[in-house]
């Protein structure tokens, strides 16, 4: 039971930190202003890990390699700790890097789910909220192709629902492959 609690705590902390690092990569890719409250939150949460990595992996273009490497490092560390807790030292350690990549993909899909849900909530509850344009900007690149294919029904945009179903299907496939 104690191992299950430790497993849950490690998984939660790592997924929150890893998701914040991935969100930082995405914010940089979209060139969101560093003064944006979401960007300020991500930077405050992840600077302690990103800044030392930035010395080795400087920012080039739109891809924040230091944040991406930090997310991979967190996923790799999570895999090492989880395997040690579950199975001890008797492990196939060569599988750690592919497992960490699957964890990164898992976090990315859940991050997209969270962004879509928050964007939908903002659009329904308070579309004029200060953060609503930020979440619209974050979801627009993934929703735009679906919006071109799926017409609005009675004034309602169904593309977030379709994207949510697609993301859930991808998460189910990933669960079968990885875990």
Residue positions per predicted region:
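Selective transmembrane helix interface/packing segments
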Residues: 1-179
